[in-house]
Every structure is written in C-alpha cells, then in structure tokens.
Swiss-Prot record:
Any GO molecular function: DNA binding
Encoding gene (name): E6
Protein name as annotated: Protein E6
Organism: Human papillomavirus 35
Function description: This protein may be involved in the oncogenic potential of this virus (associated with cancer of the uterine cervix).
Top-level taxon of origin: Viruses
Chain positions of all zinc fingers (unnamed): 30-66, 103-139
Lineage of origin: Viruses, Monodnaviria, Shotokuvirae, Cossaviricota, Papovaviricetes
Subunit note: Forms homodimers. Interacts with ubiquitin-protein ligase UBE3A/E6-AP and thus forms a complex with human TP53. Interacts with human NFX1 and MAGI3. Interacts with human IRF3; this interaction inhibits the establishment of antiviral state. Interacts with human TYK2; this interaction inhibits JAK-STAT activation by interferon alpha. Interacts with host DLG1; this interaction leads to the proteasomal degradation of DLG1.
Length: 149
C-alpha cells in the first residue's frame, strides 16, 4: 500500500485522508496480535494521538489490550527514574503544560487537569525510555482505604 516511507501518513487522520475513508469506516489491524481493531479502539487510537506503524507497507494500529500489555512491558524494561512535577519543570526548563506526558497505562496524552492532579496529590512522573509518563483520570487508581466498622 505505502512502499515509500516518505509518503506514509503516520497519524490516523492523515491516513484517512490518504485512503479517502472516514474514521468511522477505516479498518486497521493491531501490529501485535493482528486482530482488527474495534471501532471504539480506532477512535481511542485517534484521540490518544498514537502513530500508525507500517509492516511490509501496510498500516497498523494497536488494540487496547495489546497497548496496555506492551506499556507494562516497556515500564519494566525501560524505567529510568521518577520525579515530582516541580522537579520535572526545573529539569526540563518548561512548565508541565508544555510537556508531552502520556499515561503510563494507556498512553493517552495527559491534559492539564491530570498533570495538576499529580502536583496536588504529590504523585511522581516517570521517565520510561526517555519519555515522561503519569496517570490519566481513567487509569488513576485510588488509594485503598481501610474499612470502617
């Protein structure tokens, strides 16, 4: 389909334009398990601003099950260190709102509210293979409370 790497669209919106299909019609397979992405996964792929990858000229996305699985594998393999938000701002010489920080679990880019939550709750951001991660609202796990009797 796209043999020349220079002509390959790497964002889903651009791929849709190139093949003249809407996001509601386009079919993508998962690069890992090779299963066809469900429509909700195609929408998530676009919303999470993930990149299309190519194998033998064919475009692939990633299903949510594989995305979460390989995100965990990356965390185990490539974890470097964790820092608080204020330290990260000083280290990068940028405000958090200007940094791309993805969710460590689902890879969704964190919005300003999610980044602020890390500051308010004194949670760290993690450097995984040179990329910064935290937790989005959907993947945030509340701390376990003791049961009152």
């Amino acid at each position: 389909m796209f043999q020349d790497p220079a002509e390959r669209p790497y964002k889903l919106h651009d791929l849709c334009n190139e093949v003249e299909e809407s996001i509601h019609e386009i079919c993508l397979n998962c690069v890992y398990c090779k299963q066809e992405l469900q429509r909700s996964e195609v929408y998530d792929f676009a919303c999470y601003d993930l990149c299309i990858v190519y194998r033998e000229g064919q475009p692939y996305g990633v299903c949510m099950k594989c995305l979460k699985f390989y995100s965990k594998i990356s965390e185990y393999r490539w974890y470097r260190y964790s820092v608080y938000g204020e330290t990260l701002e000083k280290q990068c010489n940028k405000q958090l709102c200007h940094l791309l920080i993805r969710c460590i679990t689902c890879q969704k880019p964190l919005c300003p509210v999610e980044k602020q939550r890390h500051l308010e709750e004194k949670k760290r951001f993690h450097n995984i293979g040179g990329r910064w991660t935290g937790r989005c609202m959907s993947c945030w796990k509340p701390t376990r409370r003791e049961t009152e009797v």
